[in-house]
């Protein structure tokens, strides 16, 4: 059967995967060495600084290895970074009957958006060497503005999400985006003349890409061994275009990977949709894999 609901696959299911894997160890294979910590945090999509970032910065956790919530058919060892910007385009509001007296912020924002979207054609030419990760890309996920139908919009705000492959330099990516926005704003010519646009760019999030550490091999090998046995097929080590909290551990020299319950792809999970789902058989099998992995690592 399947279980449906928002966050079922990303990542409530792994609360169960990890918790019941630990319970299995307690019941039938108590560890002879080491300790296990379960970190249930909720701020990954906002950078992770209030959850794992806070725990790490305060020295409240110092693990040797870590596994974060993921899917069942691959073990993820690298992932994209993410830059999010909020762009405020300020024009001058006016009555629609006398549009010449204002500056249309929406037209200006549209001009800037066209310049940003054109970047995606260039990003297609930039290829990552990490299997599972293709190229950078840009998305505008939210836009708001205007006050009424009969009013020339005086202000428009939109939010940009720029995914960065591991080979990219985040500072250079941000500088290039800001320059594109600035150049587009400067080149905008209001159809009826008028003042120039005022544009403000604010960074909302900068999450670095994750690159694998050599010390992750015990985790990778154990997951591939037991995953292959339980699922009956090879479990490859790949990168993912997502960004996660794992980078916060890896940036502090703690080897980490991503593995858990779920389908082969994010698309199959219907993540972020009302019909997000997980196959319960994947949940059961991933829990078995994690229990075996922990048993190996804690008894070696």
What are the language-model segments listed below?
Residues 6, 39-41, 238-240:
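Structural motif
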Residues 1-9, 67:
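Catalytic-core environment of secreted peptidases
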Residues 11-84, 298-299:
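Acidic/histidine-rich catalytic neighborhood of metal-dependent amide-processing enzymes
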Residues 71, 76-78, 83-300:
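Metal-dependent amide/peptide-bond hydrolase catalytic core
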């Amino acid at each position: 059967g399947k279980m449906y609901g928002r966050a079922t696959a990303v990542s409530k299911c792994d609360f169960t995967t990890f918790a019941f894997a630990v319970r299995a160890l307690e019941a039938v294979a108590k560890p002879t060495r080491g300790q296990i910590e379960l970190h249930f945090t909720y701020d990954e999509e906002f950078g992770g600084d209030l959850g794992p970032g806070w725990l790490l910065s305060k020295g409240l956790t110092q693990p040797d290895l870590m596994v974060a919530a993921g899917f069942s058919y691959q073990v993820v060892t690298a992932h994209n970074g993410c830059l999010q910007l909020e762009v405020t385009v300020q024009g001058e509001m006016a009555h629609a009957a006398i549009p010449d007296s204002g500056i249309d912020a929406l037209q200006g924002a549209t001009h800037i958006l066209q310049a940003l979207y054109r970047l995606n054609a260039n990003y297609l030419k930039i290829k990552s060497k990490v299997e599972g990760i293709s190229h950078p890309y840009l998305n505008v996920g939210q836009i708001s503005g205007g006050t009424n139908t009969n009013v020339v919009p005086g202000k428009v705000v939109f939010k940009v999400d720029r995914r960065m492959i591991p080979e990219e330099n985040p500072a250079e990516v941000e500088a290039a985006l800001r320059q594109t926005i600035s150049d587009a704003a400067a080149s905008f010519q209001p159809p009826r003349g008028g003042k120039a646009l005022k544009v403000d760019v604010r960074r909302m999030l900068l999450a670095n890409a994750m690159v694998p550490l050599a010390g992750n091999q015990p985790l990778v090998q154990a997951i591939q061994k037991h995953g292959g046995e339980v699922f009956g097929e090879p479990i490859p080590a790949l990168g993912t275009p997502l960004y996660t909290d794992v980078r916060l551990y890896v940036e502090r020299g703690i080897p980490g990977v991503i593995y858990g319950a779920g389908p082969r792809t994010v698309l199959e999970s219907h993540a972020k949709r009302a019909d997000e789902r997980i196959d319960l058989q994947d949940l059961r099998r991933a829990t078995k894999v994690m229990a075996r992995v922990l048993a190996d690592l804690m008894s070696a």
